[in-house]
Swiss-Prot record:
Family membership: Belongs to the paired homeobox family.
Protein name: Cone-rod homeobox protein
GO biological process, any: cell differentiation
Region (Disordered): 94-155, 236-258
This protein's UniProt keywords: Activator, Developmental protein, Differentiation, DNA-binding, Homeobox, Neurogenesis, Nucleus, Sensory transduction, Transcription, Transcription regulation, Vision
Subcellular localization: Nucleus
Record gene name: Crx
């Protein structure tokens, strides 16, 4: 108990006890003193007789075991650790002397050339043709083969590009005449595939005389398979195997079961003046026409 009461170095507890020589160390402006350095070991000075004994053992072996070091330490009256350090320093000095002797024996020009030659001997030169192989086996010169044109030029374009209604314009007159020339018919096609100008769809009611001309203006939008077919096989109204129903004239078709179509026919009112006049009465959907019969139930 009295050991804690002995006066010693005054320490501060929560900065309350500020007496003693170390009070200045608590102030922030005063730098703390570094830890005391470890006292260096005194440099050992060997006598001539000690050096002779150590050199004699070093001539026998540069790495003596602990027993040989202890025996020499007893002879020269030194600790065994000092003998061990002396042998360590002596081996380093011996290596340095040998390097200096090698440098003196070689000319200055050979010394500068010896280092690159030594570096090249350690590493094998990499051939210029060494190319890292691809683990997937695909070389740099690989390029996927594009599908070639199997039929007409329009077929190749259709396989590469995406179909768009705006990209399909009506063909010129000369090319259209070549398409109608000959070829198998397409009677099994869902729509008639003739290239008629778009004005035939909106110009006059006579353009709706037959089903083939009725769908002619919608071909660029209803038949995306048109550019994928051969050139001379696009007209169903010509060729040797055309059916009699499709080979007839528009007038004969209209005489059978297809009458001339008019935009007014689709409307309920035949009177042109009253076509776009719709009389709507908001009271019609109501069940009770009389307003007095209206009853609202509060939910």
């Amino acid at each position: 108990m009295m050991a804690y009461m002995n006066p010693g170095p005054h320490y501060s507890v929560n900065a309350l006890a500020l007496s003693g020589p170390n009070v200045d160390l608590m102030h922030q402006a005063v730098p703390y003193s570094s830890a005391p350095r470890k006292q260096r070991r005194e440099r050992t000075t060997f006598t001539r007789s000690q050096l002779e004994e150590l050199e004699a053992l070093f001539a026998k072996t540069q790495y003596p075991d602990v027993y040989a070091r202890e025996e020499v330490a007893l002879k020269i009256n030194l600790p065994e650790s000092r003998v061990q350090v002396w042998f360590k320093n002596r081996r380093a000095k011996c290596r340095q002397q040998r390097q200096q002797q090698k440098q003196q024996q070689q000319p200055p020009g050979a010394q500068t050339k010896a280092r690159p030659a030594k570096r090249k001997a350690g590493t094998s030169p990499r051939p210029s043709t060494d190319v890292c192989t691809d683990p997937l086996g695909i070389s740099d010169s690989y390029s996927p083969s594009l599908p070639g044109p199997s039929g007409s030029p329009t077929t190749a374009v259709a396989t590469v590009s995406i179909w768009s209604p705006a990209s399909e314009a009506p063909l010129p007159e000369a090319q259209r005449a070549g398409l109608v020339a000959s070829g198998p018919s397409l009677t099994s096609a869902p729509y008639a595939m003739t290239y008629a100008p778009a004005s035939a769809f909106c110009s006059s009611p006579s353009a709706y005389a037959s089903p083939s001309s009725y769908f002619s203006g919608l071909d660029p939008y209803l038949s995306p398979m048109v550019p994928q077919l051969g050139g001379p096989a696009l007209s169903p109204l010509s060729g040797p195997s055309v059916g009699p129903s499709l080979a007839q004239s528009p007038t004969s078709l209209s005489g059978q079961s297809y009458s001339t179509y008019s935009p007014v026919d689709s409307l309920e009112f035949k009177d042109p003046t009253g076509t776009w006049k719709f009389t709507y009465n908001p009271m019609d959907p109501l069940d009770y026409k009389d307003q007095s019969a209206w009853k609202f139930q509060i939910l």
